[in-house]
Amino acid sequence: MKLADVESTMQKSVEATLRSFNTIRTGRANASLLDKIVVDYYGSETPLKSLASISTPDASTLQIQPFDRSSMGAIEKAISLSDIGLTPNNDGQIIRLNIPPLTSDRRKELVKLAAKYAEEGKVAIRNVRRDAIDSIRKLEKSGEISEDDARDQQDQVQKLTDKFSAKVEQLLSDKEKDIMTV
């Protein structure tokens, strides 16, 4: 496993963690809250963002304007059945989602959820490290690289692991501040 591949895979783990963070609701409206919602549209599971334009007219409202008005009911149903905890208001042309302010208990729950996502990201990074070090050891055992080269490569992999784990920690810290800001 090349060092560039290790770095690329670790970067993807950080990006996946960031995508998970974006699904956590803060006190402000954010279109990424709806990223994971899929709508049963004429019998096929379709992502909401491919059926409608999503905008944020103000800090506490999400506005969904379907490209096809006949999909309004299906979109409304998908939002109601999702776990985002918002009730859609349909006026026949636009669906609005009002984002209520978060209670302090809910904020604490969301911080715990963010910490869980961060831990999952760090576990993924450590798994990449483990795989890389295993492949370095195999190369060393087979005699393809020397013991010194193996140690150097393992040190480089560890430095990458530390770097990307710190990135995840920074993302978590930023998300916690975002969630706890009233």
Swiss-Prot record:
Gene3D superfamilies given in the database record: 3.30.1360.40, Ribosome-recycling factor
GO CC field: cytoplasm
Entry annotated with the keyword 4Fe-4S: no
GO terms under biological process: translational termination
SUPFAM superfamilies in alphabetical order: Ribosome recycling factor, RRF
Localisation per UniProt entry: Cytoplasm
NCBIfam families: frr (TIGR00496)
Function: Responsible for the release of ribosomes from messenger RNA at the termination of protein biosynthesis. May increase the efficiency of translation by recycling ribosomes from one round of translation to another.
Family: Belongs to the RRF family.
Protein name: Ribosome-recycling factor
Organism of derivation: Synechococcus elongatus (strain ATCC 33912 / PCC 7942 / FACHB-805) (Anacystis nidulans R2)
Lineage: Bacteria, Bacillati, Cyanobacteriota, Cyanophyceae, Synechococcales
